[in-house]
Amino acid sequence: MEKKPFTPREIVEKLDQYIIGQLDAKKAVAVALRNRYRRSLLHDKLKDEVVPKNILMIGPTGVGKTEIARRIAKISGAPFIKVEATKFTEVGYVGRDVESMVRDLVETAIRIVKEDKMKDVQEEAEKQANKRLVHLLVPGKKKSQSVKNPFEMLFGGSDEDDRDRDQSSEEVELESTRKRIAHQLAMGELEDHYVTIEVEEQQPSMFDMLQGSGMEQMGMNMQDALGNLMPKKKKRRKLTVREARKALTAEEASKLIDMDEVSQEAVYKAEQQGIIFIDEIDKIAKSGGASSADVSREGVQRDILPIVEGSTVMTKYGAVKTDHVLFVAAGAFHMAKPSDLIPELQGRFPIRVELDKLSIEDFVKILTEPDNALLKQYKALLETEGISLEFSDDAIHKIAEVAYHVNQETDNIGARRLHTILEKLLEELSFEAPDITLGTVTITPQYVEEKLGKIANNKDLSQFIL
């Protein structure tokens, strides 16, 4: 597990830095994460019996369901993927099969483990890259092999000794030059010099075209079988020493890490720490009367069921068991209820959390409190144009009121409404910013009313503009 396991309270405090409210949901995922650490301390026999308690989040869009799961993955360093339930089709139909979510999870784990391994060999890789740079900056002369005549081979010749002496002195001089260049490289004096290196050509292969077509598994097997028969093309590129060092370091690091070991660790990490977030799960629930669409939706549920229950999925890195993967499902459940899911799938999500709708006070906090708060982002963006943007407390409250009012009158899209409203509010200022010198601009309630009042109060206009 992570080097320093966080307590549930610490996890909630970390989530509070980015997400406002929703304490019940934060507590549920914090306990689920802590239980993974607790399970890792059990003896092997009992460890296999303890399975994660999957979570079902119920709440309107834009209240923080996805963000909670994403932040949890970052806190724990666990492999995390987000999938939409609506993207999958049941077996036998065109579209993505549900097993692809497990393959995507393993790919994410591979990337995480590979990055960690590359950091471990970074120092050695940079040494090797610098050696290659020295040889690129001071290339050696190719040895000329002259054809000897038979008499010279029999009786020897003085020219050969002279040639050896010349070559020896050239090698000494070359070595001396390379040492000088290596010193200059270390001092950073040659960063803007250009060198020509060979790099692998990045072109989409025919196998990439199979992605998303439901044929990933077939494409994967074909690539494994034919990969060695089709070597990657290389092309020559002229780069600065600074850029070339990055490319060569990455290449050398790849040589130093053992991909078999990476695959083994990644599969273990995906199995034991993986988190799969299934969004829009309410869209595959039955919606009242039976129809052919409902039959198809139920088919997707039945395909998801064995993955959530615990099964073995074949990937190009080996077999992956999903018994201990944590599944977090989420949905608004406007048209359907959680009880509209098939009973077997309902039973696999024992922890249910209802997320609250956002109030005016929540909107005020979202605008100001998180580390990545929207107002901080807009201030930083306009500061690049030399404009210091300030918002009065009353103006912030007015923006929150407008967001809440529009959500109530039209579709409730939660905190995402703030993006639309702030864009409209600052549209003119953002457009004129490069051409004017204003110094400090303070947004007041009157300015908010002037820019948004008419639109917010007109239901027809707000549906189209906000």
From Swiss-Prot:
Recorded GO CC terms: HslUV protease complex
Annotated residues for binding of ATP: 20, 62-67, 279, 344, 416
Q: Which UniProt keywords apply?
A: ATP-binding, Chaperone, Cytoplasm, Nucleotide-binding
Q: What GO molecular function terms would the record report?
A: ATP binding; ATP hydrolysis activity; peptidase activity; proteasome-activating activity
SMART domains per the UniProt record, alphabetical: AAA, ClpB_D2-small
Q: InterPro entries annotated for this entry?
A: AAA+_ATPase (IPR003593), ATP-dep_Clp_protease_ClpX (IPR050052), ATPase_AAA_core (IPR003959), Clp_ATPase_C (IPR019489), HslU (IPR004491), P-loop_NTPase (IPR027417)
Q: Name one Pfam family in it.
A: AAA
* Comp. bias regions, Acidic residues: 158-174
Q: Where in the cell is it found?
A: Cytoplasm
Q: Name one GO biological process term.
A: protein unfolding
Top-level taxonomic group: Bacteria
* Chief subcellular location: cytoplasm
- The answer to keyword Chaperone applying to this record is yes
Region Disordered, residue ranges = 153-177
> Which portions of this protein are annotated as coiled-coil regions?
none
Described by its record, this protein's role is as follows: ATPase subunit of a proteasome-like degradation complex; this subunit has chaperone activity.
Q: Of which family is this protein a member?
A: Belongs to the ClpX chaperone family. HslU subfamily.
> Quaternary state and partners of this protein?
A double ring-shaped homohexamer of ClpQ is capped on each side by a ring-shaped ClpY homohexamer. The assembly of the ClpQ/ClpY complex is dependent on binding of ATP.
Q: What is this protein called?
A: ATP-dependent protease ATPase subunit ClpY
Q: To which species is this protein native? A: Bacillus pumilus (strain SAFR-032)
The gene it comes from is: clpY
